């Protein structure tokens, strides 16, 4: 959801609460739980999963490897569930022409730097830079060039914008901020 008027432009950033992250976390959790149950059933010699008898998988080395993969998968899926629950990467970009200030806010991982808040003066913005990398995995990223600070990404690298969408977004933002567009 974005909100825009003559003087203020607010763009909300999704973060890690995306459908694909939910799907990967569920698939990884269920798959690793299955691996762990098969490894445990081969160790105990009892059927915890009724798909095949536990005698078909001996504990050393197949059961140990499956248990290891199950535990590793549970750690990775718990990491994904934590990033989803903390909503890492979400936030907003606020461009305020009235005050002459740009605010960029993102949620990070818990700790000292949980809240990432950047504030700039609009007169320090040199340009909006559009970086396009072609090939099999093409990516298009929008950057804001700040005097003395370098480039700050405004779009995520995993957002798949079409060339027309990224050009339109860059043109609208450059027009709103009254800065030039650079293509790299």
Swiss-Prot record:
It is found in: Plastid, Chloroplast thylakoid membrane. The gene is ycf4. The keyword Plastid applies. One of its GO terms (biological process) is photosynthesis. Pfam families: Ycf4. The chain crosses the membrane at residues 21-43, 58-80. Seems to be required for the assembly of the photosystem I complex. Belongs to the Ycf4 family. It comes from Calycanthus floridus var. glaucus (Eastern sweetshrub). It comes from the Eukaryota. It is a multi-pass membrane protein. InterPro entries: PSI_Ycf4_assembly. Its main location: plastid. HAMAP family: Ycf4 (MF_00437). This is Photosystem I assembly protein Ycf4. GO terms for cellular component: chloroplast thylakoid membrane; photosystem I. Keywords: Chloroplast, Membrane, Photosynthesis, Plastid, Thylakoid, Transmembrane, Transmembrane helix.
């Amino acid at each position: 959801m974005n909100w825009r008027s003559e003087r203020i432009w607010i763009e909300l950033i999704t973060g890690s609460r995306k459908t694909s992250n939910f799907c990967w976390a569920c698939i990884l959790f269920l798959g690793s739980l299955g691996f762990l149950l098969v490894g445990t059933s081969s160790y105990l010699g009892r059927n915890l999963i009724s798909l095949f008898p536990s005698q078909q998988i001996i504990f050393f080395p197949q059961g140990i490897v499956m248990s290891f993969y199950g535990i590793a998968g549970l750690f990775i899926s718990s990491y994904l569930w934590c990033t989803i629950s903390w909503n890492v990467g979400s936030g907003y970009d606020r461009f305020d022409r009235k005050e002459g200030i740009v605010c960029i806010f993102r949620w990070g991982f818990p700790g000292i730097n949980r809240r990432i808040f950047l504030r700039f003066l609009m007169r320090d913005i040199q340009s909006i830079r559009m970086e396009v990398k072609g090939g099999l995995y093409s990516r298009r990223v929008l950057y804001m060039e700040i005097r003395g600070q370098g480039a700050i990404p405004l779009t995520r690298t995993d957002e798949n914008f079409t060339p027309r969408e990224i050009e339109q977004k860059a043109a609208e933002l450059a027009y709103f901020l009254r800065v030039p567009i650079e293509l790299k």
